[in-house]
């Protein structure tokens, strides 16, 4: 036995040497590397989930709508501008979601049954969320700077729209916390409707116009339905946390009425556009069968999955709306 130990340690070609020195150590290293890879993978997944990617349709469809309107006016769209604009809006939206996560947790609003449990379940630390949000806001500002060099839009107009949206995304729960004083619905109606559509349109055409504000109305109403259903679902926990939302002020019955208006008024507007101007505006009506089950669930107060389902409806309606505008014959759309 005394003679076999040195042979094994010296890495001889014998069985003991191979198993002792060339198998055990690499296995240990591979195991450690595997654990690090799994930790990194779970960390990245946590960051992605913290962004609430299912809500991104609310920011992507307005960008597509604004670009489609620019296409009908100018006859072409700069795809690079479209891409950079979409990334800029997504970065601000994601950062706003992180701000919302941080302040909801710090104010004791999020709990074990909340839709977003990133901080409640200690998946991420509060400082991680803050740092990630700051990185996204900074990256968004870089995209806005790039848009200034790529687009012919005046700097003051670009800054006004972009930083208006950025400020709204932060002040929704950060700072004065508009969400907590029943003003969150106003922020969503303005930011994820007229402002985002105008931004996408302006960077393409190089000037500000009232036209995108009008065309944004159907999409803005449907997007607000996502937030309203979310606030109605969280009504009891929000009351306990001491915050005030529009859903709390209205109560379940009036909240149901408002949800129906937000859900079905856009379809009425599409009917008017389709009958008076061009039949391509009837395309969003294809999503109408998806709206009736949502109305029934809201009426029965089965709120659990309504925000996510409304977001899915919002995405499809927005896409059909964009296609309807693109397919409209030249000169058939109202130009005010």
Curated annotation (Swiss-Prot):
Which stretches of sequence are listed as region Disordered? 1-22
Q: Which species is the source of this protein? A: Danio rerio (Zebrafish)
Q: Name one GO cellular component term.
A: Golgi apparatus
User: What pathway annotation does it carry?
Assistant: Quinol/quinone metabolism; menaquinone biosynthesis; Cofactor biosynthesis; ubiquinone biosynthesis
Reactions catalysed: menadiol + (2E,6E,10E)-geranylgeranyl diphosphate = menaquinol-4 + diphosphate; all-trans-decaprenyl diphosphate + 4-hydroxybenzoate = 4-hydroxy-3-(all-trans-decaprenyl)benzoate + diphosphate
Query: Which Pfam families does UniProt cross-reference here?
Result: UbiA
Q: This chain belongs to which protein, by name?
A: UbiA prenyltransferase domain-containing protein 1
**Topology versus the membrane, per the UniProt entry?**
Multi-pass membrane protein
One BP term from GO: cellular response to fluid shear stress
Q: Where is the chain membrane-spanning?
A: 79-99, 129-149, 158-178, 180-200, 201-221, 254-274, 315-335
Q: Which InterPro entries match?
A: UbiA_prenyltransferase, UbiA_sf, UBIAD1
Keywords of this protein's UniProt record, alphabetized?
Endoplasmic reticulum, Golgi apparatus, Membrane, Menaquinone biosynthesis, Mitochondrion, Prenyltransferase, Transferase, Transmembrane, Transmembrane helix, Ubiquinone biosynthesis
**Family as reported in the entry's similarity comment:** Belongs to the UbiA prenyltransferase family.
Q: Which gene encodes it?
A: ubiad1
Report whether Transmembrane helix shows up as a keyword of the record. Answer: yes
Q: What does this protein do?
A: Prenyltransferase that mediates the formation of menaquinone-4 (MK-4) and coenzyme Q10. MK-4 is a vitamin K2 isoform required for endothelial cell development. Mediates the conversion of phylloquinone (PK) into MK-4, probably by cleaving the side chain of phylloquinone (PK) to release 2-methyl-1,4-naphthoquinone (menadione; K3) and then prenylating it with geranylgeranyl pyrophosphate (GGPP) to form MK-4.
Name where it mostly resides.
endoplasmic reticulum
As one GO molecular function, the record gives: prenyltransferase activity
Q: What is the effect of changing residue 82 to Q?
A: In bar(S847); increased oxidative stress, DNA damage and cell death specifically in blood vessels and the heart
């Amino acid at each position: 036995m005394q003679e076999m130990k040195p042979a094994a340690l010296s890495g001889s070609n014998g069985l003991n040497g191979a198993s002792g020195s060339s198998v055990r150590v690499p296995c240990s290293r591979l195991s450690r590397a595997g654990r690090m890879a799994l930790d990194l993978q779970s960390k990245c997944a946590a960051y992605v989930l913290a962004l609430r990617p299912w809500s991104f349709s609310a920011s992507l469809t307005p960008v597509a709508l604004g670009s489609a309107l620019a296409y009908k006016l100018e006859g072409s769209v700069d795809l690079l501008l479209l891409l950079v604009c979409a990334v800029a809006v997504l970065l601000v939206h994601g950062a706003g979601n992180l701000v919302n996560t941080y302040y909801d947790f710090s104010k004791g609003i999020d709990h074990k049954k909340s839709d977003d449990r990133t901080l409640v379940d200690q998946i991420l630390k509060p400082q991680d969320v803050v740092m990630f949000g700051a990185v996204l806001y900074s990256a968004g500002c870089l995209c806005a700077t790039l848009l200034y060099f790529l687009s012919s839009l005046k700097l003051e107009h670009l800054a006004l729209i972009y930083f208006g949206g950025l400020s709204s995304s932060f002040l929704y729960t950060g700072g004065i916390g508009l969400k907590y004083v029943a003003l969150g619905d106003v922020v969503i109606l303005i930011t994820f409707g007229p402002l985002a559509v105008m931004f996408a349109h302006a960077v393409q055409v190089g000037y500000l116009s009232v036209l995108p504000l009008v065309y944004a109305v159907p999409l803005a109403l449907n997007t607000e339905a996502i937030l309203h259903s979310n606030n109605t679902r969280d009504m009891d926990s929000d009351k306990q946390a001491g915050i005030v939302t529009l859903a709390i002020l209205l109560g379940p019955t009036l909240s149901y009425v408002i949800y129906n208006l937000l859900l079905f008024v856009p379809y009425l507007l599409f009917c008017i556009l389709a009958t008076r101007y061009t039949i391509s505006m009837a395309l969003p009506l294809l999503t109408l069968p998806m709206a009736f089950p949502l109305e029934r669930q809201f009426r029965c107060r089965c709120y659990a999955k309504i925000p996510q389902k409304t977001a899915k409806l919002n995405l499809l309606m927005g896409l059909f709306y964009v296609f309807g505008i693109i397919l409209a014959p030249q000169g058939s759309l109202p130009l005010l």
